[in-house]
Amino acid sequence: MIRLFTFAIITVFLIVISRLALQRAYKYIKLNKKINNTESKTRLSIRLVSTVPYYLPLFEGLQNFGQYVLPDYPVAAIPLYKKIILPMLIFYMNHAILGLVTFFALYYVLVRNKSPIPVHQLVRFNSMQSILLFLVGSLFGAVFRAFPIEFRISFLGLMVCNMMFWFVLSTITYSIVKAVQGKYSNIPVISEAVRIQISGYST
């Protein structure tokens, strides 16, 4: 009798879980179909607005990794970095509250379902993705800073720093290019998490 009761509970539990999984999969497929149908119709102004939120993970990546490795690159882009990007980066670093304010502004104004303004799906997607990239960059930066200073200035430490910087830069560049094209980027894990997050939202 006890075994039968236990089996019945497990069966009901599996049925409920399966139903929830199917509902989630249906929403995900429906969202992807909707996304594919609207990609080619996105206006240029919306595409450009979709790239703006990526300044947040970019500056976070420059703060955590870029400022340590970029000055050693003997390329023509370094003067451009020092004259244009570095002053903005210093301003960002000196006003730590700016990143936090931008983070909450992106979420409450552009990502949230009850946004005070109508938001295009492409803008919402890229805003959410920039938030996740910002969080990933912040986490990597915190972990890297947790290591002893001897490791961080060593050859291996600079290699790790270099790798993290190029990971952040490449994902942001890829996302911006896709946004300008009016398409949705597909970064493993991160883009999937974004699609799941906005799957219940209306455009």
Curated annotation (Swiss-Prot):
Its main location: plastid. It is found in: Plastid, Chloroplast membrane. Disulfide bonds: none annotated. The keyword Transmembrane applies. It comes from the Eukaryota. GO terms for cellular component: chloroplast membrane. It is a multi-pass membrane protein. Keywords: Chloroplast, Membrane, Plastid, Transmembrane, Transmembrane helix. InterPro entries: Tic20. The chain crosses the membrane at residues 2-22, 51-71, 84-104, 131-151, 153-173. Belongs to the Tic20 family. This is Tic20 family protein Ycf60.
